[in-house]
Amino acid sequence: FYNVDTIIRIGSCGAYNEDLSLLDTILVDNAYTEGNYAYELNEEDCHIMNSSSDINKVIEDTAKELNIAYVKGNTLCTDCFDYYVKDVNSLIARFPKDLNIIGAEMEAFALFYNAKLLGKKASCLLSVVDSHYKHQEISADERQTSLNSMIKLALESAVNL
């Protein structure tokens, strides 16, 4: 539609790993969902999608060049903010244990799935803005002004593609 072949999504996420701190950058390896996006779109029972490994390699190399720290891992793609979930611990207990989910966001699964269907490439960088384990969050103002490392990494990586 827009003749785009590669997308690096940037956004915010909640931390599901006690080792993550506010404003840490996550490079998403796989996005897991309990939702039915793939089935509704394409009648496929699919709940995990991987990002494009070649884009991730460029991002990793760029992070090293720029001395930007990141954590690579798997995320949960939710249909609602976990802040509003009745029992977030019950939600976390449902995750496949072998996935080692480290964060939660709301778009990566669909992005990766659409990229697969269309023969495109997609990756995702996230900044941690709240922590389930540490009961911390950054302010709305900080969400607008403090995500510079992630944004710089995405832009410089795009130049290096």
List where the protein language model places each region.
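A C-terminal functional module that forms or caps the active site or interfaces directly
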Residues: V88-K121
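Generic non-transmembrane alpha-helical segments
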Residues: V58-L66, N114, L153-L161
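General beta-strand structural signal in soluble alpha/beta enzymes
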Residues: T6-I10, L27, Y70-C77, I102-M106, ...
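His/Asp/Glu-rich mid-to-C-terminal helical/loop segments that flank catalytic regions of hydrolases
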Residues: H132-L161
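Active-site rim beta-loop-alpha module in soluble metabolic enzymes
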Residues: C46-D98
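Metabolite-binding pocket within alpha/beta catalytic cores that recognizes anionic/polar moieties
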Residues: F1-V58
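Glycine-rich beta-alpha junction loops
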Residues: G14, L76-D82, A110, V129-S131
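Zn-dependent metallopeptidase/amidohydrolase metal-coordination segment
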Residues: F109-E142
